[in-house]
């Protein structure tokens, strides 16, 4: 799974194909796995404080992820994220089927959500900031007024106008 993810983030694999291959490896796992995954995830130092600071200045914060709602939603709620879009894992009778359902969060969906959320808030795209780390984030990074490569793969660092190279805020 890690190898497939890494190759997709470097832009070597089609994201949709890579996602389906990764998810297929999860077939048969109990949905209790989400609790175990959540317990292992930690926010980068300063991430929640950054969201709080942005809110105090009147900004909205969105998270569009190629990850899964089953963990992303809980993290977003804990951090106070205003908008969330991620992939959905199919679960039947308490077990993962190895499939996703609904709209897959591709690079085009990431751009669409940036545009939707900007329009919803009466903003021009030039008034938005987008951060990402993988090839799937590049179109979104390039569409925003300020595009930032965050601890990103080389392909993203080479094309993003701004970079954050340390994981802590």
Question: Where are the model-predicted features located?
Answer:
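Active-site neighborhood of HAD-like aspartate-dependent phosphohydrolases
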Residues: 1-10, 20
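Long, charged amphipathic helices and adjacent flexible linkers at domain junctions
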Residues: 13-24
């Amino acid at each position: 799974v890690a190898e497939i993810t890494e190759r997709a983030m470097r832009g070597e694999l089609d994201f949709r194909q890579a996602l389906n291959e990764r998810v297929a490896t999860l077939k048969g796992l109990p949905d209790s796995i989400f609790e175990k995954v959540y317990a292992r995830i930690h926010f980068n130092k300063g991430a929640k404080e950054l969201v709080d600071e942005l809110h105090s200045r009147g900004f909205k914060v969105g998270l569009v992820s190629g990850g899964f709602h089953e963990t992303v939603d809980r993290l977003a709620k804990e951090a106070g994220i205003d908008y969330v879009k991620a992939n959905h894992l199919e679960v039947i009778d308490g077990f993962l089927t190895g499939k996703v359902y609904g709209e897959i969060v591709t690079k085009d969906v990431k751009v669409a959500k940036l545009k939707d959320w900007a329009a919803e808030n009466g903003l021009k795209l030039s008034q938005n900031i987008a951060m990402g780390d993988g090839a799937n984030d590049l179109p979104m990074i390039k569409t925003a007024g300020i595009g930032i490569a965050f601890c990103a793969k080389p392909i993203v660092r080479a094309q993003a106008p701004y970079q954050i190279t340390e994981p802590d805020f």
